[in-house]
Every structure is written in structure tokens, then in C-alpha cells.
């Protein structure tokens, strides 16, 4: 059974298309109009081992908030849909990823219960047209729409680009492990029988 999803999200603020294949090869293509965010989405695809296509048109004449938020919601929805009933998955994943001086840790539980803990240092306000305060909101939006628990911590780092990118890579690697199929898991990986 293919673990894929195609999500279209249209609001008065944005028009989003996300296509996701959990069992891909890390091929990604993103065009949101926010170049640094596109770079981060590419990290999710590449290091998550997902094939990911994202096309967003948003109200960038205001700022990047709605574009980034709606894209993140659509990505989380695609992740939830592609997972289906979650039978046979590992469910949990964690990763610690360095990027030069930056070190980020992420842990995920595909529990069906959304909860996000995000700890990072104060960063310079902008990376190009990307507002660094959106990083937490991206992870919160993915968490809520995918219905997963996510913990992200920055353990060290000075360069804002490195700090944010290390977080996305860590989340990608944690998701890669959590969505992986495990032949030893029969059915739903929960004593409740549902996730």
C-alpha cells in the first residue's frame, strides 16, 4: 500500500499544494516564495527520506507568516494522511544533528496526541525574508495537524542559519525513524490498539 498524500489547502491568505511520499528517496521541490523556508523544506525531504513537492502562493506582500503557517499545516496533514492507520510503524524517532557549531535534538512520537516543546536560543530576527520566530510556529503547526508529539531542543549554536537548519535536519531524521515500517510490529504500535 502506497504511503502517499496530496493535500490542497486554500484560504483567503494562501493557496497550498503538498505532495508527500513517505517511502521516497529524498527528492524534494519547494516553491513558497520564501527562499530560506524552501531550503528548510528541502531538508525535511532529503533527511527524512521523503519525496516532497510543495507549491504555495501566499500574501507575501504582508509578510511570510500566513504562507509559512499554511504550508506547515498542509505538510502535517499530508504526513497524517500518508501514515494511514499507522500499522507496522516504529512510532518513535529521535535524532541529534550537528551543523558546524550548532547542535539540535529532536524526538517524535506519532501518538495521535499533538504536543510541541521547542527550546532554542534567541536568534537574529531575519534570515533573508524568513522571520526566525516562525521556526517554533512551523513545528507547532506540523504537530497540531499531524497529531504528533514533538520535542526540539537546540543544545548549542550561534549562527541563526545553522541553528534553524540543524533543527529541521534533526526533525527530519526523527520522523524518518518514526514512520519507518518495522517487520516486528504486528498491527498498531500501541497497547490502546489505536494511534
Swiss-Prot record:
GO terms for molecular function: imidazoleglycerol-phosphate dehydratase activity. Its EC number is 4.2.1.19. Pathway: Amino-acid biosynthesis; L-histidine biosynthesis; L-histidine from 5-phospho-alpha-D-ribose 1-diphosphate: step 6/9. Keywords: Amino-acid biosynthesis, Cytoplasm, Histidine biosynthesis, Lyase. The keyword Lipoprotein does not apply. GO terms for biological process: L-histidine biosynthetic process. It is found in: Cytoplasm. One of its GO terms (cellular component) is cytoplasm. Its main location: cytoplasm. It is an enzyme of class 4 (lyase). It catalyses: D-erythro-1-(imidazol-4-yl)glycerol 3-phosphate = 3-(imidazol-4-yl)-2-oxopropyl phosphate + H2O. Pfam families: IGPD (PF00475). Belongs to the imidazoleglycerol-phosphate dehydratase family. This is Imidazoleglycerol-phosphate dehydratase. It comes from Frankia casuarinae (strain DSM 45818 / CECT 9043 / HFP020203 / CcI3). The gene is hisB.
